[in-house]
Structure formats: structure tokens, C-alpha cells
């Protein structure tokens, strides 16, 4: 790639977290030299379940949707967002489909750089941990909203689940005697 293209890629990455918050510009610059660029048309799958992923994807332009195995929409992502990290944290094993919903220009960051930054840079790893935490919170909120019960099983006291008193024995009774 020409130096102008590399500079543009570096400038773009540095506008978005976690790259904008990292204190190691020389490493990000080295990484940019190893990026791949991919153009994907609207409707094309980018990552499919039961395959191996070797990249962290940065959306330079366009939008994608993340689908569960049953084609259920999990979320939409757009310019400046990253995907593919969940599979990289599972040694590349893909469980969700990522599909373009607009024509996309993607930067593909090799897994080696993702793993290096994830291990060596707290800002980088905390960024992805916060995303995972927020996704879990969103899933739990959705479960609570869809629950037909007055009390969610995820947050209710154990006492409220008991229908009869618990069985107990003295502490000097052996397991064999209790059985």
C-alpha cells in the first residue's frame, strides 16, 4: 500500500476507541502495515458459524448485522465499530453470522495483533470486556422484559423458589446414614 493510504487508515483508526485511547501510537502504526482491506456488498455474509476467524474487523464504512444461529437479529453495527473479537477470544471459533446490510469497506486486523494488544494493553482489553459486559446486561434486560413471571429467576432470592422446607440433618450424621 502507498504511504498516503496507510496514513489515512491510521488516522481513521485513531478516531475510534480503543485505538484513540491507546498510548502506543508506534504499535498501531506497525499494525496498520499488516491490515487487509475488504469490500463486501450488501447482503453478503462476512463471517459464518462453524468456521474459523483470523481477523478483528473494523467497519470503515457501511453497516452489518449480527445474527444468532436461528437467524435472530442480535444487533447492528456501523462505521467505527469492531466485530470478530468474540471468536478471536475463542481461538477463532465462529458461532454467529455477520452479514452486510449496506455495502461495506472493512479493515481486517490480523488476530496476532488483536491477541497482542489484548494481553499487553489494559485500555484495549478493558474496551472489549466492557462491550461483553454491556451485551450480557442487555441480554438479561431482554430476558427480564420477556419473562411472564412476576420475579425473574436470575434475580430472585432462593427462598422464593422453595416450595417446602429444606431437608436438614445434624452435623454429626454420616453421609451413609443420611442416605
Please identify what each model-predicted range represents.
Residues 169-179:
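The conserved cystathionine-beta-synthase
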Residues 1-165, 176:
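Cytosolic regulatory regions built on CNB/CRP/Popeye-like sensor folds
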Amino acid at each position: 500500500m502507498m504511504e498516503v493510504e496507510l496514513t489515512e487508515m491510521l488516522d481513521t483508526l485513531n478516531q475510534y476507541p480503543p485505538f484513540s485511547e491507546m498510548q502506543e501510537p508506534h504499535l498501531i502504526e506497525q499494525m496498520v502495515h499488516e491490515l487487509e482491506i475488504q469490500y463486501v456488498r450488501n447482503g453478503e455474509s462476512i463471517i459464518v458459524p462453524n468456521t474459523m476467524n483470523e481477523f478483528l474487523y473494523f467497519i470503515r464504512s457501511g453497516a452489518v448485522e449480527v445474527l444468532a444461529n436461528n437467524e435472530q437479529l442480535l444487533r447492528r453495527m456501523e462505521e467505527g465499530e469492531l466485530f470478530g473479537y468474540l471468536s478471536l477470544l475463542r481461538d477463532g471459533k465462529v458461532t454467529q453470522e455477520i452479514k452486510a446490510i449496506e455495502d461495506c469497506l472493512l479493515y481486517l486486523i490480523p488476530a496476532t495483533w488483536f491477541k497482542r494488544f489484548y494481553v499487553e494493553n489494559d485500555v484495549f482489553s478493558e474496551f472489549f470486556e466492557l462491550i461483553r459486559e454491556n451485551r450480557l446486561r442487555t441480554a438479561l434486560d431482554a430476558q427480564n422484559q420477556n419473562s411472564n413471571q412476576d420475579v425473574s429467576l436470575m434475580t430472585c432470592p432462593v427462598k422464593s423458589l422453595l416450595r417446602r422446607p429444606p431437608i436438614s440433618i445434624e452435623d454429626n450424621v454420616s453421609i451413609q446414614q443420611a442416605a
